[in-house]
Curated annotation (Swiss-Prot):
A motif (NPA) lies at residues 69-71. SUPFAM superfamilies: Aquaporin-like. This is Aquaporin. A motif (NPG) lies at residues 206-208. It is a multi-pass membrane protein. PANTHER family: AQUAPORIN TRANSPORTER (PTHR19139), MIP17260P (PTHR19139:SF199). Water channel required to facilitate the transport of water across membranes. Involved in osmotolerance. It comes from Encephalitozoon intestinalis (Microsporidian parasite).
Length: 251
């Protein structure tokens, strides 16, 4: 019993640290590219999102769920892929991790507190994006992301087997082992989705990443637009994979 409790605590702590590392990487890239006024600022951020995601998943997946995204975890809870209380614990750990990432960035930032938070806080782009544009951008980006995460890691296809371990469907073949390639696939998805949101929402598709700088700056404009799109999109992507696009067996 004590060992199980310790494993749970380790897993929760691991999820918090994973969220911290990912958040610190992304926030640092956003701030650094903005301060340096690099012409490749969007590319820098997109590559950081993708590569840091790959590294975090590979290094933390043995001790925790390595979601570092509350939209994935909520979708997993509502599709019964994870226990409710455990899932809520992971979500809390994720939010704390992102808050700590903002705190760490503030200590490292060479510019003042307000400017740092204004720079990393998500908001509509300067191209005239409306609240509706932002909502649907975050909805579709998060739906795509969560669907891919479910298909490769949370709910990958597993053929039915009998008591002897043989396939129930004689025509069934051993499925592709995605354990090695899933982090790479998810990280690359993070990267290309970050580029897809450039015209409207900026491409956050992560409630934790969105919430932390808003909470630290006490600036809540567009908060519900972002979180509403992200959580609804995540649930849609998860349900689509579980109920509609999970491979059907022929038995």
């Amino acid at each position: 019993m004590a060992k199980e409790a310790l494993k749970t605590l380790q897993s929760m702590f691991g999820e918090m640290v994973a969220s911290f590392v990912f958040g610190f990487a992304v926030y640092s890239a956003i701030l650094g590219s903005s301060i340096s006024q690099s012409s490749a600022d969007k590319v820098i951020v997109g590559l950081t999102v993708g590569f840091s995601g790959i590294g975090v998943i590979y290094s933390f997946c043995d001790v925790t769920i390595a979601h570092f995204n509350p939209a994935i975890t909520l979708a997993a809870i509502l599709t019964s892929k994870i226990d409710v209380l455990q899932g809520l614990g992971y979500m809390l750990a994720q939010y704390i991790g992102f808050m700590l990432a903002v705190c760490a960035l503030l200590v490292c930032s060479p510019v003042e507190y307000k400017e740092t938070l204004d720079t990393i806080r998500p908001g509509p782009t300067d191209f005239g994006a409306t609240s509706l544009n932002v909502f649907f951008a975050e909805f579709f980006l998060t739906a795509i992301f969560v669907h891919i995460v479910f298909a490769t890691a949370v709910n990958p296809y597993k053929p039915k087997v009998d008591t002897e371990g043989k396939f129930v469907d004689p025509d069934e073949k051993e499925p592709v082992d995605r354990r090695i390639t899933a982090p790479l696939c998810i990280g690359l998805t993070l990267g290309f989705l970050a580029f897809m949101g450039l015209a409207s929402s900026g491409g956050a598709f992560n409630p934790g990443l969105t919430f932390a700088p808003m909470a630290m700056s006490n600036t809540w404009s567009h908060f519900w637009i972002y979180l509403g799109g992200q959580y609804l999109g995540g649930l849609t992507g998860g349900l689509l994979q579980v109920l509609v696009l999970y491979k059907l067996s022929s038995d």
